[in-house]
Amino acid sequence: MADERKDEGKAPHWTSASLTEAAAHPHSPEMKDQGGAGEGLSRNANGFPYREEEEGAFGEHRSQGTYSDTKENGINGELTSADRETAEEVSARIVQVVTAEAVAVLKGEQEKEAQHKDQPAALPLAAEETANLPPSPPPSPASEQTATVEEDLLTASKMEFPEQEKFPSSFAEPLDKGEMEFKMPSKPGEDFEHAALVPDTSKTPQDKKDLQGMEGEKLPPVPFAQTFGTNLEDRKQSTEPSIVMPSIGLSAEPPAPKEPKDWFIEMPTESKKDEWGLAAPISPGPLTPMREKDVLEDIPRWEGKQFDSPMPSPFHGGSFTLPLDTMKNERVSEGPRPFAPVFFQSDDKVSLQDPSALATSKESSKDEEPLKDKADKVADVSISEVTTLLGNVHSPVVEGYVGENISGEVKVTTDQEKKETSAPSVQEPTLTETEPQTKLDEKSTVSIEEAVAKKEESFKLRDDKTGVIQTSTEQSFSKEDQKGQEHTIDELKQDSFPISLEQAVTDAAMTSKTLGKVTSEPEAVSERREIQGLFEEKTADKNKLEGAGSATIAEVEMPFYEDKSGMSKYFETSALKEDMTRSTELGSDYYELSDSRGSAQESLDTISPKNQHDEKELQAKASQPSPPAQEAGYSTLAQSYTPDHPSELPEEPSSPQERMFTIDPKVYGEKRDLHSKNKDDLTLSRSLGLGGRSAIEQRSMSINLPMSCLDSIALGFNFGRGHDLSPLASDILTNTSGSMDEGDDYLPPTTPAVEKMPCFPIESKEEEDKAEQAKVTGGQTIQVETSSESPFPAKEYYKNGTVMAPDLPEMLDLAGTRSRLASVSADAEVARRKSVPSEAMLAESSTSLPPVADESPVTVKPDSQLEDMGYCVFNKYTVPLPSPVQDSENLSGESGSFYEGTDDKVRRDLATDLSLIEVKLAAAGRVKDEFTAEKEASPPTSADKSRLSREFDHDRKANDKLDTVLEKSEEHIDSKEHAKESEEMGGKVELFGLGITYDQASTKELITTKDTSPEKTEKGLSSVPEVAEVEPTTKADQGLDFAATKAEPSQLDIKVSDFGQMASGMNVDAGKAIELKFEVAQELTLSSEAPQEADSFMGVESGHIKEGGKVNETEVKEKVTKPDLVHQEAVDKEESYESSGEHESLTMESLKPDEGKKETSPETSLIQDEVALKLSVEIPCPPPVSEADLSTDEKGEVQMEFIQLPKEESTETPDIPAIPSDVTQPQPEAIVSEPAEVPSEEEEIEAGGEYDKLLFRSDTLQISDLLVSESREEFVETCPGELKGVVESVVTIEDDFITVVQTTTDEGESGSHSVRFAAPAQPEEERRPRPHDEELEIEMAAEAQAEPKDGSPDAPATPEKEEVAFSEYKTETYDDYKDETTIDDSIMDADSLWVDTQDDDRSILTEQLETIPKEERAEKDARRPSLEKHRKEKPFKTGRGRISTPERKVAKKEPSTVSRDEVRRKKAVYKKAELAKKSEVQAHSPSRKLILKPAIKYTRPTHLSCVKRKTTAASGDLAQAPGAFKQAKDKVTDGISKSPEKRSSLPRPSSILPPRRGVSGDREENSFSLNSSISSARRTTRSEPIRRAGKSGTSTPTTPGSTAITPGTPPSYSSRTPGTPGTPSYPRTPGTPKSGILVPSEKKVAIIRTPPKSPATPKQLRLINQPLPDLKNVKSKIGSTDNIKYQPKGGQVQIVTKKIDLSHVTSKCGSLKNIRHRPGGGRVKIESVKLDFKEKAQAKVGSLDNAHHVPGGGNVKIDSQKLNFREHAKARVDHGAEIITQSPSRSSVASPRRLSNVSSSGSINLLESPQLATLAEDVTAALAKQGL
């Protein structure tokens, strides 16, 4: 059960752990904030307490970290809270006890310890534990404590040793395995950290299931090897306390953990001395694994948490690696093993070596739980033993050093993680499996910082280790204990120790049970409260820690051990002070830690609580003030943390790595000291693959995950982002962050932390990260302060559901855009603060992120790795990688500095990041959508979505205002060169994207696209990659939340395990999370979704949401105000899904049901349209009806997304396989990926109105339009439900040549262009847009973009927008190629409204496809009316696309005031125009879409005009775009009422889609015509399907006119094209919202209301002035053009499929003769011939005579007789004859030299020879005779 638990819990937890580990550093701060002791350390890292804790915690912090980890592990997670409650009491009491006992123990018991250490005589390895103990020489109470701890540890070890002996039976195998494996990893001890990093992901899945606790601890360190090892060690300690806690339930087991400690100490003492990691694993491994498993088995709930504790204990012992490895090998081999090999290796090393030392401390701590009295002793003994252990470890400096490093750093991380684990524990109970991982990661985070401190202290110890090891260790322990451990241990003691010892046992068991129960029920709600309360407690705890400072030094030591159990018990390490009383209470309070994140994270955190926790922990650790759970409390923590280490902070920020250590400034400072002091630690770290101590410290401190993150990046996702959970997002973030974020507060790994830790902490962390980025630019000290502010920005980060978004962009921008981020930092922070409520959403999103990250560890990690390696990892967002060029152009004005400065890095990072973004956005979006669909579609969907719809209606109105505000704000931000928009949008967008992704895939994606895109464009897709990174986790979390996670087992193993873990954890959380999430998710999802989006989009609203105290209020407020945004986020997510492909349809379907519930919500209907559109794209429209199907698809897509994520690094091929439904899906994914950026680009353009933006927009949007057009065509074809003219485009990609077979079918109502990418295209999905046919892709993108942009308001529009975003990315990829062909696309992009219109068309198409679910359409009708109401209020006479555009614009307007004004101006025009009808159709979606689109639309014209040769047309478009925007808005508002009419007409644009494609070529020349046409067509199509879905039966007055508008899709090109009024017949004047929008300024003539003659006539689509480039003239590399009979009209593409008959192939070796294999299979005849060696073979020596061995075996009798071969050898050589003579029977037969019984090797074949009995004697006699 323990293993299962571990697997289940660990998978999510591990997934979280990956991200968490990546986010472990963010978690560390948060853990510090959250966990009393661990939090204290974190605080100390962030603030003075942390520093004190750090110093004290360097040696102590390991144990303390263990406690913190344990507490956070949820095993003793509550203990942390409870301990934290009585932190002061515990501090005083423990200080007394520990001081007295430490002195006594140091004096008397130190000798005991020395004796005991004789047991662990090799405990020079205790140096590792010394790492746990503050290895620093400060000889102070800590010194005494060290002796005491050692003594106690030895006592505990001895005590535990017998128990270990008890456990050996169960631990025996793990021990052997663990020892072997531990030795194995230990030997690669240098790689141990690396292994911890690399295997983290692998381990994570297995550990989640198998070693939730074990792995959790181990895995958490994996994020950064040391963190992982430390985490494992700390978790071990935690686990041991956990076991002790189970010991409460498993009284005997704590001794066993202690025993493992003894084993650890003794065996490590023996073996570990030389091979600490090697020998140590021997005894500890089994013990710890056994203990962990047994304890976990004993404690079901605590299992994962306990696994966290026990697992690290084996790690601590070093043998833990084996159990971890064994378990991980078992588990990791199962699913994560793919990642496991990398992560596991590093993790093993880190965990293996570190755990031995940490295990000793932690096991000592564990024992302390049951043995409170002894705990003091054990604490000292543990420390001393650890010191000894470290000393032993020092013997094998590399391994021992690694152990020390890992132990110290991991322990720091563990401490922080424990602290953080308090929060994750809160969620972990919900996700016992998932959460334990979070806890583990949190522990890991805590441990990492502790480990860093302890590592440095360990290093110091190592320096002093020989003679001074104990003294030095003790001194270090004392000094550092006094310094940092005062706080750390104070916290730990306050948090865990008192409760650990006294309550820990009771609370451990109780907490285990309580946590299990609370985990089940209160977890969701409680998590939120706990997160908030925990942060408050953390803040108070931090103060207490600071106040307890000195007293805590001695006390800390005790809590260090007691806390080990206590921390495991009570997650809130920090809470121990304040919430000593809370220890019991923390069962729920503990959940409170995860609660804010829990509500949001309950959805996602259930999936990857650890991720979120880790992310939050990362942020918490990096920015303690950041915990959004309690904005004020966490900020206070951050502030206190900042004050604590203001100098340290600047110190830390001095280098990104140092800034990483900002989390543990003290630890970092100590580490830096040790950095300088112990170069071998650096060497060890480097050996471990951590890149050296400073790198380790940087990574671990940056996020306490950056190591993990960087490692995962090196490994190349998410999740994940860290080493375990966040290798992907966190890792990318960490990698970027580690490189770019130069502060601890700046924790790109915070993204995992966001998802892992409570949303708030993560957000604040994210804010901190952002602030830190900005402050890295601005000031180091400010960064921490920014961290204080950060909680709100972090929430916005979480809003994106991907804290990673800002972090990643910031990371990406680190080199180039840091200044931009610095300028943006304030805005981003403001936005983040404003979006405190969105933090909950972000938490959910973050939660989803971890799974991705978990899966990402391989997927994202590879991406990160690849991008780190300089490989352009083409993920879904692969195309955006080229975007950096465009981004460079656009970013030149917006964030050009970033892209230009870090273009290569951005490209490389963006390649990964984009893939991550793509995957994460898609996954997060899918997960979010799944989550929303399943959860919100469930009661939450009904209630939440309905409420959201209502709120969305309100928000629609509010958004009109807020959009104005937000668009003004965005305009303001854009005015700030999008630097702040990039930062704010990056913060907002990232928060937004995260929250949105979590909220709804499309919303997240849309918002991410929208908000992040500006950042993307500015940051060169930095934001997008971040969003992707974070969002995949969100997706994963959501996917995990959903059975959907399990829906696609084909995902990566990690994906499966993540999803399995997450699903199990999330499903476990599903009941309560669905309920609580119904409450919280309704609240948080609504508040998070809306608030996050509102936060991102509504600077004003964000301001309100800004306050942590206002989180709920703001959430509600934003729920009301932000539903539009939330749904836009959903649209973004759905676009992200579109980008994801499968998830799009799933999201659409999921959203559809949601929309059904949100009938009144215009956003909902838009989402529904989007869902329909996505469905059309992803699911050709069969699944659109079934929400269950969607759920499954979503799940599949989520997993597929994860698969994509893992595969993403390779290419979009994973996505393509992930999108088997339709080849189109991959393109939508690709397209969606671009729209994610394009919308934001539009936003940037509109908001910024900058030429660069326009340029970038034009390029990107051109491509985006092409991609979107293509995608749109795909959509049309995919969902022929309402296809008037179905243009089926089968795109086959061969060697960059895209063969597009366009089959025009006039079967659908509206021209539906279905682009089906043949399987060949899938691998080149991303490239396809480039090669596809820039024209076709551009045209398609134009269609898709025009439609998505037009229909962007509609859900399909949003997907379209996401398609556009992806298209944009693709455009970037093949931007240059598309530049010419993209001129039209650019114009289309410029006609954001056009694109929106076509988005609406797409929505229409989707809706048409959704026509299958007529009910949904009816719902959409209902929704649309509500949307129309709101849209009417906000008249968007944008036509089908315009409606969405205006609304989107409204949201986007924040950046662009001109757009708003012009939109208003054009409102009247477009109100008149029947475009309003189309807008009406898009009305519901527009809020979201418009929010994103308006700026984009407005900007897009400018952008296009700038970039396009048709500057006149573009400028006309641009000039008109603002007016058109306003008109579109007006029309959208008007269109709301006219939505029915428009909807009917909207489907027509689908038919235009093929023409759009055909017009692609013309688009360059007549860009506007094409753009208008395509956009109109697309919008028309979208709006029409939307309208149809929304008002299936109602044909509004504009049936012809509306049709004209909608049909205008083909003429939409002409409408769009100023010079193409000739397409009027086809373009519907109203249906040319893009055209209309453009028309107001430049092509009002293009506003031809002539209904498209044949919506299904692709030929008319080609009537557009610019048909797609003549592909006939294109020469493909592979000659595929020969097969493409493609006419601009479309439908004439002939894709010839040649079947390859391999039957005629002849094998080189002729083996085919024997293989009766036919292609059909089944005819393979494998002949198995048994060999009779006796008959056929002749022995060289003649031994075969005696070998009666048949291959089958059975008759072989091997008699083993030991012969004196010394004599025999000589005899054989010299006296063989005599020997033969001596062998009676044998000698006669065998030649003198060839004894039949004696083989040539001298071994006697004692098979069946008669003389075998006497042979030995004979030989001996013969030899003896011969004088041998």
UniProtKB/Swiss-Prot annotation:
Functional note:
The exact function of MAP2 is unknown but MAPs may stabilize the microtubules against depolymerization. They also seem to have a stiffening effect on microtubules.
Q: Where is this region: Disordered?
A: 1-86, 109-379, 397-490, 573-684, 765-794, 823-863, 930-986, 1005-1044, 1087-1165, 1206-1228, 1304-1373, 1405-1640, 1778-1802
Q: Name one GO molecular function term.
A: cytoskeletal regulatory protein binding
Modification after translation, per record: Phosphorylated at serine residues in K-X-G-S motifs by causing MAP/microtubule affinity-regulating kinase (MARK1 or MARK2), detachment from microtubules, and their disassembly. The interaction with KNDC1 enhances MAP2 threonine phosphorylation.
Q: Where in the cell is it found?
A: Cytoplasm, Cytoskeleton; Cell projection, Dendrite
The record's principal subcellular location, in a coarse class, is cytoplasm
Q: What is this protein called?
A: Microtubule-associated protein 2
Q: Where is this region: Calmodulin-binding?
A: 1452-1472
Where in the sequence does UniProt note compositional bias of the Basic and acidic residues kind?
1-11, 109-119, 174-194, 205-218, 256-276, 290-306, 363-379, 412-421, 451-466, 477-490, 667-683, 944-986, 1103-1161, 1324-1333, 1359-1373, 1412-1430, 1445-1464, 1471-1481, 1527-1544
**Phosphotyrosine sites (modified residues):** Y746
GO annotation, cellular component aspect: apical dendrite; axon hillock; axon initial segment; CA3 pyramidal cell dendrite; cell body; cytoplasm; dendrite; dendritic shaft
Chain intervals with Polar residues compositional bias: 596-610, 778-790, 1613-1623
Q: Bias regions of kind Low complexity — which residues?
A: 120-133, 1546-1557, 1567-1578, 1591-1607, 1783-1796
Phosphoserine sites (modified residues): 28, 136, 140, 143, 283, 333, 346, 476, 496, 520, 550, 596, 599, 603, 608, 626, 726, 730, 737, 739, 823, 883, 892, 938, 1050, 1139-1140, 1145, 1161, 1165, 1352, 1539, 1560, 1592, 1654, 1680, 1783, 1788, 1791, 1796, 1809
- Complexes and interactors: Interacts with KNDC1 (via KIND2); the interaction enhances MAP2 phosphorylation and localizes KNDC1 to dendrites. Interacts with DPYSL5.
Q: Where are the Tau/MAP repeats?
A: 1662-1692, 1693-1723, 1724-1755
Q: Where is the composition biased (Basic residues)?
A: 1431-1440
Any one Gene Ontology BP term: microtubule cytoskeleton organization
Phosphothreonine modifications at: T734, T1160, T1358, T1606, T1609, T1620, T1623, T1650
